[in-house]
């Protein structure tokens, strides 16, 4: 039986183009990435550099206007005692939240990686990620109610008989306040709750790659559990901890909503940027303040890169 074979019409022009890109794969890759690179370079880096450049403009306090006269006054103003306190306050909170997140995340990540599987592991994944599905502002407002005077936290401590300890703790000048919701401790707890999942998941992924044979070999060689943790587990988990710390450190450093809702009076860097740009209209000073977290995060990324953080992302 005869069969009719349908042949597509020849397209010599298309074949030449295809052959050209076949012999020049680098050009094809360049054209493929040209659109995303232009978007990333113009929209992201272009707007960022424009913002930073405005940090050298002049702001007239009398007319409340910005003039393109270049000056270093805004950069020098960052080293004023009041602005220096804002930077130090923000940096201290970011470091404290990062360290506490690593300490709290490690046991849960270890249990998820070594002792769960199947449905139980899926349950833990959902439990860790579930708070991330809720609105950020809703979570922050919810914590203001939990930590308020006569709130759930105070009621719980009363029933445990720990209210005198809380009262004594709130009298401390650095972390205390009238209530938990107006204390530095309360602000720290809210930051810790919101950013903790960003630490748990990278640490769990790093521990998941830890071969059980290494733990068995360490035990066979006579190492105690403490020695195994120090010389085997911890070095292999450091890239995951460093990867998680990128999120906790940078997100705390740039946050302005939690410091506005919870904690004692006192600006963070994000609050200062919002205040200078939104309330006062001093865009040069706001741009100068944005330079601070950029430099701090760049230095931190250079540090954690040496710890293998990018390999664990």
From Swiss-Prot:
What is the name attached to this protein's record?
Answer: Inner membrane ABC transporter permease protein YdcU
Any one of the GO CC terms: ATP-binding cassette (ABC) transporter complex, substrate-binding subunit-containing
Coiled-coil regions listed in the entry: none
Which family is annotated? Belongs to the binding-protein-dependent transport system permease family. CysTW subfamily.
Q: Which GO terms describe its biological process?
A: transmembrane transport
Cytoplasmic compartment: which residues?
A: 1-25, 114-122, 176-187, 252, 305-313
Q: Which domain of life is it from?
A: Bacteria
Which gene name belongs to this protein?
A: ydcU
- For this protein, the parts annotated as crossing the membrane are 26-46, 93-113, 123-143, 155-175, 188-208, 231-251, 253-273, 284-304
Concerning InterPro entries, the annotation shows: MetI-like, MetI-like_sf
Membrane topology label: Multi-pass membrane protein
* The keyword DNA repair appears for this protein: no
Any idea which UniProt keywords this protein has?
A: Cell inner membrane, Cell membrane, Membrane, Transmembrane, Transmembrane helix, Transport
Q: State where the protein is found.
A: Cell inner membrane
Q: Where is the ABC transmembrane type-1 domain?
A: 87-302
Give the Periplasmic membrane side ranges. Answer: 47-92, 144-154, 209-230, 274-283
Q: Which organism is it from?
A: Escherichia coli (strain K12)
Family annotation (Pfam families)? BPD_transp_1
| Keyword field contains Membrane | yes
């Amino acid at each position: 039986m005869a069969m009719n074979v349908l042949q597509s019409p020849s397209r010599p022009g298309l074949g030449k183009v295809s052959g050209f890109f076949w012999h020049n794969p680098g050009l094809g890759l360049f054209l493929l990435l040209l659109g995303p690179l232009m978007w990333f370079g113009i929209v992201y880096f272009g707007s960022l550099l424009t913002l930073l450049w405005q940090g050298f403009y002049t702001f007239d306090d009398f007319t409340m206007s910005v003039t393109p006269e270049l000056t270093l006054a805004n950069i020098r103003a960052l080293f004023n005692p009041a602005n220096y306190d804002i930077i130090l306050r923000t940096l201290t909170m970011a470091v404290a939240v990062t360290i506490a997140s690593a300490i709290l995340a490690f046991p849960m990540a270890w249990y998820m990686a070594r002792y769960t599987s199947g449905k139980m592991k899926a349950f833990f994944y959902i439990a860790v990620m579930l708070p991330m599905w809720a609105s950020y502002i809703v979570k922050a407002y919810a914590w203001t109610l939990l930590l308020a005077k006569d709130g759930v936290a105070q009621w719980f401590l009363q029933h445990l008989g720990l209210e005198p300890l809380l009262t004594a703790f709130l009298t401390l000048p650095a972390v205390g306040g009238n209530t938990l919701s107006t204390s530095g401790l309360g602000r720290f707890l809210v930051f810790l709750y919101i950013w903790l999942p960003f630490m748990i998941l990278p640490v769990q992924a790093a521990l998941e790659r830890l071969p059980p044979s290494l733990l068995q070999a360490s035990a066979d060689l006579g190492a105690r559990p403490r020695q195994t943790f120090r010389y085997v587990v911890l070095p292999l988990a450091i890239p995951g901890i460093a990867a998680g710390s990128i999120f906790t450190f940078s997100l705390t450093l740039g946050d302005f909503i939690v410091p506005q809702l919870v904690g004692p009076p006192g600006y963070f860097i994000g609050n200062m940027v919002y205040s200078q740009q939104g309330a006062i209209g001093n865009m040069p000073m706001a741009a100068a303040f944005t330079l601070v977290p950029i430099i701090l995060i760049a230095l931190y990324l250079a540090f954690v890169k040496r710890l293998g953080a990018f390999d664990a992302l």
